[in-house]
């Protein structure tokens, strides 16, 4: 056993000796490489001495201190050799070395564990460590000092200060702090040099991670040389050459062409672990000889890398929505290609075409409005300015496709607008827009073309984008024409349209908004008069499509259900549409134009009104403008329909208008106006001005919003096409609770709505008086909105949207006609009901009559049946433009009416209103977007119903009239279910939100 143990010890000892030998060999090899490199480097500088000096054996020649003092003199420019004393005695040598070391310490060169005795004895590791510190301080640190201020910080791990030099710095109690500072300075300088190399080489596909293995192939050296002079190196050929060939070629080219001394040999690099200090010493020469190369880097990004991508985050929108701006340098000019990208299932179809689109040549017909100009740079710069500055209307020139710029200019115009999803241009409508013009089956175009348009847009997003922009331009111009008159009409449009347009117009039509302002300023373009209908650019397209469709009788099919927006639009449009009523015939093309102008202006005004509304809750001016302008078109009718002063309510009140006006007074006088005017113009406008149908269904109700008539209005059958972003996106700036509460009506609102339920009967007596007005205004109301042609245009409008949803609010007294024809007939047949609804707004004061409420409920039930029939008919035909989204206020109204609003995501390019039973939301859960929407809607609806049930118990009574309300009330009565739904919603929201967080920016 002893023999075996002895053998084991011998074997272990032998292994240890072999390991020591290997380490020693590596150390010797490294010392040899460093010695050779440092010797060459020292000789480069000693050549400058007079007389020149030369180092043959570094470890021997440095022992007397003369070489060291001469080197420091050259590097620092100070005179040190005069202190040198030549002598063979050790004491004098130590004195010379000590003077040199003292000079280094005075120069803030940290020397740890290096003393004169070790240098005088020629200790290899300490001598090399001393020389390395001199190189690092006098060359690398000085050269990288400027780079560190300009170059981006590199996240790459810096190379170590050097094995030998580090080993020569054993920390001592007295020098511990100095060691830390020295190591920190070393790493900082090395890191700066590495960052410089990376910037030079990355453009050629060479990844330099350190100053060791990354240089072994020789490609890094070649890349640095190519960065200095691209003509010297062929990187493709280098990839085929061997490592030795690349290294030899690199060192040779650097010496011959760049006059960089050859400090290294291929053998020095072709090892497993090349010496970092030697490589850094050599590479630093490139930076020393070509310091101007760093300044050129500023331009290299443009020259070498033609495309820079910049992400412009739109805070108002979900993090999913980001605009990618590609900056292309073309002939010194910058053009911008803007793609609005979203992660929502339906890809957004908004494309800002590379082709600059100028609106110089506008054909209101929109058939051929493609006036492309080369002002793309200016236009795109303006777009970027809007994105950066957030100025919605900074590009107000008609010649510029502001709608597109508005894509990026989706801004925080309102807190609400921020919360609303940013609408993208109804890209599919571009095709449909042309289709209606090309084919007169606008109903077909409107119904079928949107999908085709969507596909075609997907296929030809660029062309469509151009078309869309041009159509928008046309619409803007047309909107400008009516805006002179519609500026005031838009006042009313502001509120409702503002609510929906808060999201849409603010987001998509920042430019339109600007153009709207500009348009308002350009009141003289043409009298909005008869043919001028102000329409949002998005809806303009829809209107264009719906123009003939309405004429064909598919009015509701062509009606985009931007109910919230369009209630105001319809009221304003009702007044404007009266002009159409006066001249219905020219509207096939002009109605489109008018619809475009009206919707554009309405959307613009809506945006501004939204802005002002969120800013202030009182601003009668825009409404006054509407009153002025609407009377300009239909002053008489609106004088009757809009007698209430609330329209004069300052725009500052518009926020309340969005929330409360829609809740409370959406009907009051603006319904009167909208209904009277709309009823009058319905028959006429239906054929003549499909834009009216395109005008949001809420237009009738928008006057009260704008009028801010806070009298409790009769129960509104409010349709809300809810963008799913409203739910699961608190928009980061708005607390989730605030977003949820935004859809819950206050107790006062609930009471008002309850009183509204009571109102209908109270309105009934007034209806008698109002019937006359309604009779006079049936044509206008019907023209403004077929569904709204019924007495309470807002009810019908909401109901239409609800009809689209498939729920008839129990509170709605008047049946909604799916078709304008049918509605016109109904408006005439239901004149008492029309006047009843129209009088609901005037008779807000009569809210408190419970008997009236009972009578109203009965009438409502019968009317609901009729409306349901109409709705069923409408549902098949109704098409919702992607932009058609109601504001949260509309949502509140919808929930108050116990109707389940159809969920439309703003990103959906084609959305059809669906009749939703409580089961529809369940089916929607199968898609993650619909799941979130359904959860949100159910939660909010349940909460609202619960509050209503608690406050008045009417929810149950109303629920008895509608099976949906029954199920909802039953669901509401189960708090556990409500909390469970809320929990699920929050869970889904978190799961969907987390993947979209930009963790890289944290």
From Swiss-Prot:
Biased composition (Low complexity): 149-168, 396-409, 681-697, 776-794
Membrane topology: Single-pass type IV membrane protein
Region: Actin-binding, residue numbers: 1-288
All copies of domain Calponin-homology (CH), residue ranges: 32-139, 187-291
GO molecular function annotations of the record: actin filament binding
Keywords, alphabetical: Actin-binding, Membrane, Phosphoprotein, Repeat, Transmembrane, Transmembrane helix
Residues bearing the modification Phosphoserine: 301, 402, 619, 713, 769, 838, 841, 907
Protein localization: Membrane
Residues bearing PTM Phosphothreonine: 699
Biased composition (Basic residues): 607-617
Residue ranges of the TM segments: 977-997
Comp. bias regions, Polar residues: 500-509, 835-846, 898-910
A single GO BP: neuron projection development
Tissue: Widely expressed at intermediate level.
Region (Disordered): 149-180, 389-418, 500-532, 581-716, 749-911
Entry-linked InterPro entries: Actinin_actin-bd_CS (IPR001589), CH_dom (IPR001715), CH_dom_sf (IPR036872), CLMN_CH_first (IPR047827), CLMN_CH_second (IPR047826), LINC-complex_assoc (IPR052403)
Record bears the keyword Transmembrane helix: yes
Main location: membrane
Basic and acidic residues compositional bias, start-end: 585-606, 618-635, 650-659, 818-834, 854-863
GO cellular component: cytoplasm; meiotic nuclear membrane microtubule tethering complex; nuclear outer membrane
Protein name: Calmin
Taxonomic source organism: Homo sapiens (Human)
């Amino acid at each position: 056993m002893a023999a075996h143990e002895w053998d084991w010890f011998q074997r272990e000892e032998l292994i240890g000796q072999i390991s020591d030998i290997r380490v020693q060999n590596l150390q010797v090899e490294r010392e040899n490489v460093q010695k050779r490199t440092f010797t060459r480097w020292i000789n480069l500088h000693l050549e400058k001495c007079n007389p020149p000096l030369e180092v043959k054996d570094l470890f021997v020649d440095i022992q007397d201190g003369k070489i060291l003092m001469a080197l420091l003199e050259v590097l620092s420019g100070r005179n040190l050799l005069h202190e040198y004393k030549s002598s063979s005695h050790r004491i004098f040598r130590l004195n010379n070395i000590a003077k040199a070391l003292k000079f280094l310490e005075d120069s803030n060169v940290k020397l740890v564990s290096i003393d004169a005795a070790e240098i005088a004895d020629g200790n290899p590791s300490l001598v090399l460590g001393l020389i390395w510190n001199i190189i690092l301080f006098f060359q690398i640190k000085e050269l990288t000092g400027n780079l560190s201020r300009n170059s981006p910080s590199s996240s790459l791990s810096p190379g170590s200060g050097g094995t030998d030099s580090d080993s020569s710095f054993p920390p001592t109690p007295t020098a511990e702090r100095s060691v830390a500072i020295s190591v920190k300075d070393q790493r900082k300088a090395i890191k700066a040099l590495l960052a410089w190399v990376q910037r030079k080489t990355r453009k050629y596909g060479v990844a330099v991670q350190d100053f060791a293995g990354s240089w072994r192939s020789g490609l890094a050296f070649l890349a640095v040389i190519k960065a200095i002079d691209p003509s010297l190196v062929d990187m493709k050929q280098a990839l085929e050459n061997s490592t030795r060939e690349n290294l030899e070629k690199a060192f040779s080219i650097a010496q011959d062409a760049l006059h960089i001394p050859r400090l290294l040999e291929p053998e020095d690099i072709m090892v497993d672990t090349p010496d970092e200090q030697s490589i850094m010493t050599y590479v630093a020469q490139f930076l020393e000889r070509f310091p101007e190369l760093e300044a050129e880097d500023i331009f290299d990004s443009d020259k070498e890398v033609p495309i820079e991508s910049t992400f412009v985050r739109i805070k108002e929108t979900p993090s999913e929505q980001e605009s990618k701006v590609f900056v292309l340098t073309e002939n010194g000019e910058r053009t911008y290609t803007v793609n609005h990208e979203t992660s929502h299932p339906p890809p957004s179809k908004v494309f800002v075409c590379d082709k600059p689109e100028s609106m110089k040549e506008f054909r209101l017909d929109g058939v051929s409005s493609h006036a492309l100009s080369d002002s793309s740079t200016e236009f795109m710069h303006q777009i970027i300015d809007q994105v950066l500055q957030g100025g919605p209307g900074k590009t107000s020139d008609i010649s510029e496709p502001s709608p597109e710029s508005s894509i990026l200019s989706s801004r925080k115009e309102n807190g609400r607008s921020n919360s609303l999803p940013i609408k993208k241009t109804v890209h599919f409508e571009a095709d449909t827009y042309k289709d209606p013009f090309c084919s007169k089956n606008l109903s077909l175009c409107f119904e079928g073309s949107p999908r085709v348009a969507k596909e075609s847009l997907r296929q030809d997003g660029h062309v469509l984008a151009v078309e869309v922009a041009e159509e928008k331009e046309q619409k803007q111009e047309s909107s400008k024409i009516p805006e002179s008159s519609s500026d005031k009409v838009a006042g009313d449009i502001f509120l409702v349209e503002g609510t929906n347009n808060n999201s849409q117009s603010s987001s998509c039509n920042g430019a339109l908004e600007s153009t709207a302002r500009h348009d308002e300023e350009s009141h003289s373009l043409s009298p909005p008069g008869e043919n001028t209908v102000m329409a949002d650019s998005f809806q303009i397209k829809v209107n264009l499509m719906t123009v003939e469709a309405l004429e064909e009788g598919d009015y509701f099919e062509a009606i985009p259900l931007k109910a919230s927006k369009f209630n105001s639009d319809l009221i304003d449009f009702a007044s404007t549409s009266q002009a159409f009523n006066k001249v219905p015939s020219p509207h096939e093309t002009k109605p489109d134009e008018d619809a475009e102008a009206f919707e554009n202006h309405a959307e613009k005004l809506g945006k501004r009104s939204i802005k002002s509304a969120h800013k202030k809750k009182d601003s009668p001016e825009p409404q006054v403008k509407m009153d002025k302008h609407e009377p300009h078109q239909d002053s008489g009718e609106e004088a009757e329909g809009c007698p209430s002063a609330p329209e004069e309510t300052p725009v500052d009140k518009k926020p309340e208008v969005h929330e409360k006006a829609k809740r409370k007074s959406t009907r009051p006088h603006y319904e009167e106006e909208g209904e009277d005017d709309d009823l009058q113009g319905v028959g006429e406008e239906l054929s003549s001005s499909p834009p009216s149908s395109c005008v949001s269904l809420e237009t009738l109700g928008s006057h009260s919003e704008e009028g801010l008539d806070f009298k409790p209005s009769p129960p509104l059958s409010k349709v809300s096409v809810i963008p799913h972003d409203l739910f699961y996106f608190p928009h980061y700036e708005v607390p989730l609770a605030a977003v949820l509460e935004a859809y819950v009506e206050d107790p006062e609102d609930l009471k008002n709505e309850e009183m509204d339920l009571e109102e209908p009967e109270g309105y009934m007596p007034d209806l008698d008086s109002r019937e006359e007005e309604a009779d006079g205004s049936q044509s206008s109301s019907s023209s403004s909105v077929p569904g709204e042609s019924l007495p309470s245009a807002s009810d019908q409008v909401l109901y239409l949207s609800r009809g689209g949803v498939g729920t008839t609010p129990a509170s709605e007294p008047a049946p909604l006609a799916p078709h304008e024809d049918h509605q016109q007939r109904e408006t005439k047949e239901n004149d008492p009901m029309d006047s009843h609804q129209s009088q609901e707004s005037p008779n807000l004061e009569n809210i408190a009559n419970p008997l009236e409420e009972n009578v109203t409920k009965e009438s409502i039930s019968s009317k609901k049946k009729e409306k349901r029939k109409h709705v069923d008919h409408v549902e098949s035909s109704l098409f919702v433009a992607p932009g058609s989204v109601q504001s949260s206020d509309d949502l509140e109204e919808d929930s108050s009416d116990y109707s389940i609003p159809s969920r439309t995501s703003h990103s959906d390019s084609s959305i059809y209103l669906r009749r939703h039973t409580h089961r529809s939301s369940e089916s929607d859960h199968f898609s993650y977007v619909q799941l979130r929407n359904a959860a949100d809607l159910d939660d909010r609806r349940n909460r609202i119903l619960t509050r209503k049930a608690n406050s008045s118990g009417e929810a149950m009574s109303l629920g008895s009239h509608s099976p949906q309300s029954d199920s909802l009330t039953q669901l509401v009565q189960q708090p556990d279910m409500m909390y469970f739904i809320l929990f699920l919603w929050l869970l889904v929201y978190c799961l969907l939100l987390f993947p979209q967080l930009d963790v890289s920016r944290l």
